[in-house]
Swiss-Prot record:
It comes from Nicotiana tomentosiformis (Tobacco). Its EC number is 2.7.7.6. HAMAP family: RNApol_bact_RpoC1. Binds 1 Mg(2+) ion per subunit. Mg(2+) binds at D489, D491, D493. SUPFAM superfamilies: beta and beta-prime subunits of DNA dependent RNA-polymerase. Signal peptide: none annotated. The keyword Transcription applies. The lineage of its organism: Eukaryota, Viridiplantae, Streptophyta, Embryophyta, Tracheophyta. This is DNA-directed RNA polymerase subunit beta'. The keyword Transmembrane does not apply.
Amino acid sequence: MIDRYKHQQLRIGSVSPQQISAWATKILPNGEIVGEVTKPYTFHYKTNKPEKDGLFCERIFGPIKSGICACGNYRVIGDEKEDPKFCEQCGVEFVDSRIRRYQMGYIKLACPVTHVWYLKRLPSYIANLLDKPLKELEGLVYCDFSFARPITKKPTFLRLRGLFEYEIQSWKYSIPLFFTTQGFDTFRNREISTGAGAIREQLADLDLRIIIENSLVEWEELGEEGHTGNEWEDRKVGRRKDFLVRRVELAKHFIRTNIEPEWMVLCLLPVLPPELRPIIQIDGGKLMSSDINELYRRVIYRNNTLTDLLTTSRSTPVELVMCQEKLVQEAVDTLLDNGIRGQPMRDGHNKVYKSFSDVIEGKEGRFRETLLGKRVDYSGRSVIVVGPSLSLHRCGLPREIAIELFQTFVIRGLIRQHLASNIGVAKSQIREKEPIVWEILQEVMQGHPVLLNRAPTLHRLGIQAFQPVLVAGRAICLHPLVCKGFNADFDGDQMAVHVPLSLEAQVEARLLMFSHMNLLSPAIGDPISVPTQDMLIGLYVLTSGNPRGICVNRYNPCNRINYQNKKRSDNSHYKYTKEPFFSNSYDAIGAYRQKRINLDSPLWLRWRLDQRVIASRETPIEVHYESLGTFYEIYGHYLIVRSLKKQILFIYIRTTVGHIALYREIEEAIQGFSRAYSYGT
């Protein structure tokens, strides 16, 4: 069993047959070696006990019940005085039943079998190392054709057949008879190679360092040739150079990890521990079995048949042996990756069997569901909505979620303040949602950040820390500026919330993970907190000066008459000076709150003289004179009030309440940053 305190990482790769045997083989106290699964059976239909040497054998994988052997005898586990440590009658050790979760077995294959991941997955590692087409290797693995072994300076039967086949026609009838004689096995093993054994021999003969040297030389030669002018030839050369680079990298990986290429062909097939492929009894006495058990049974049946053909029947036709080897290869392929070669294998109900690949890959696989993405305590999940009134470092947490996440902290607060005598009373107060509970919850949440995570977490900005705030409803409120880091929007996205418990986790959340500490992309340094979606629409509406709004089109036939009537009315009554004048922005916003003006209504706002920017060459649109001698020069976006001596008395700019509100927000933000900078220096 893996000790979580001693092992910090897990490496997945190819292993040698010796390593597989070491994992699965164990020596009993009487010296007997067990570990090989030879029978395709699971449980006996009468006794309901595991079959000996089967897929659930207690001798191989350990007892089903701790300290109880297959005979029913009991021994105390860990007692040094208990002797013997195993049952001499059934051969089952008196150990903890948890051994069945990690004790492996193995199947000794009657013929080598290629691992389908290394053959069929793209890129094909076997095809890359051997520098041969994948279709050719597939035909060899599945016994569609054979190749002759290179035997130099020796006459071979294949050469003789090639010489005499066309000279002596009678040999055409005598040669096939030779392939069915008893001596053909010796000839076949000497001169003919097919199946995964042929692949294994070629991989074993490879020298990885020579492959690297030859590939580099060929790559340099192709680079020296340059462009030929033929687009098709240039693409062919480019693909060849890319292939050579992949081949060199693959060979270097094998050398660096001390992996032999022939390990990609299996001689021993590991058998998973029984607890990882269980058989469960459901209501009514029916049994539910993992699909992997059925696939293992299929492999054992075919492997035993091939063993019988090779050992007992010496006169078996070679075509039958090759066909059975192909069936064993296909059975192992289905066990490892069902459907990788085409149509997947199905059961009697036309349901596809779940192979080993299906068990470990994907969102519901062993890694993502039970190891990486498993459910944890002190976490929740809900839909996110926009929180326009939130600060950048805050998030709105629904009361229902908050009271569950911080329940233990609230209980401790109630007991410390003597508002509850024990845990039971505190839980009762929480269930009844007494007002004091929400006060304690507010105190607890003030100094405790939470972590928000949106799957998939592709980079560090996928999980950030926030200061929680209680909100009504059942949705998590989020500031729209942090959406880009999460790659989130408000169309139904869900986010998970976690509570950091340890002091180290809380310090890390405050110093490194708070949203206002992650304003720039860690990858390229660009701003990550930029307005998007709702904020862009809001800024457009806020600064839009069109009195007709952004959704009305005056060129629409339905709106043309209304627009013409409004234009005619404006020409008769509308004057620039009829628009309201305000001496400061506070008066303008106050008038808007009193509903005397609209958000996009044009108005005149007095501007400070030291901040004016006036184009000297611009001519006024209109000039209005008053009886006292003062006059107004009206331009496109501003108005100047001059005295009788043409001195500037006031300057008014033409704006809207939306522009004023945006300007004040920017001004306050800049002033706040300046104060913070001055305090820091």
